[in-house]
Amino acid sequence: PNGWQFNIDLQNRTGTGYVYSDKFINDKDALIDLESWTNRKVITKPKLIKWKPSVLKNSWCDNVVTIGLGQGFIDPLESNGLYMVVYSITLLVKCILKGSPPKAYNRTMSKVHKDNSNYILHHYMLSQRDDTDFWRYYKKFDATKTVWDEYSKKTNEYTNLYPDAIWGQLGLYFDAPKP
């Protein structure tokens, strides 16, 4: 496959997805890949979501605060989106109660979005796959140093979705040697 395929078991269905880049495969061939991977014919028309990963520079501007996916969209996994909703609301309440300026909220949310983006990117970079141009593209990036840099940041222990222990597990899982 030319991308990241996933199944997420829910109570009433299984969510199946295929994250790919149109630089490496067209939509028609991606559907063929998806059907081949699931070993079944797609029974409902897949929802094709095209997006360019992006994040707002300032989530809080004057009296307007964006929450969750309104702040940015990095990947289609629901768990990340739900986390961003909960985290941004929790942080907003803390900032309001402490009288923190919007700049503090924006700085923290920028860090959380950057960490989320880096963590997802590292899953692609550290994959052992190299069977398609999609996966070979990510081999060009050196993830070893950045994984250990993230692991070494003590601030990760308390300030975001991916504490230092998660980065350590990522390095161990993908056998990233210490630089």
Q: Can you name each region flagged by the protein language model?
A:
Residues 2, 7, 12, 26, ...:
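Detector for Asparagine
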